[in-house]
Amino acid sequence: MTNQVQNALSTIYEGIEYSLEFITPEQAQFYLTKNFDNNRKISRNNLEELKKEMRNSRFILSDSAICFDTDGTLVNGQHRLLAVVQTGMTQPFLVVKNMPSKS
């Protein structure tokens, strides 16, 4: 990768924060208040499968992060967060904040 490309990428992704969080039901509920209005509808099948995995201790940390854009809006993770709320079970997630907004 050339220095020019590295510099361009550094500028684009400057300020992105990432962490491993053990998200409690209370934290998940708070994060869901940051959901954007036009997000896709909740898939009951997807939600029920996530809840089943959590209840049976089969839910594992994955590379799919809970993501927030630069405005603090939740852009990825609503099903997983809702499953945490509904099961009452704390779960580990990769959380990324300050992602550039899609234009």
Identify the role of each PLM range.
Residues 2-86, 90-97:
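Short alpha-helix boundary/capping and kink motifs at helix termini
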Residues 102-103:
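Hydrophobic alpha-helical segments and helix pairs
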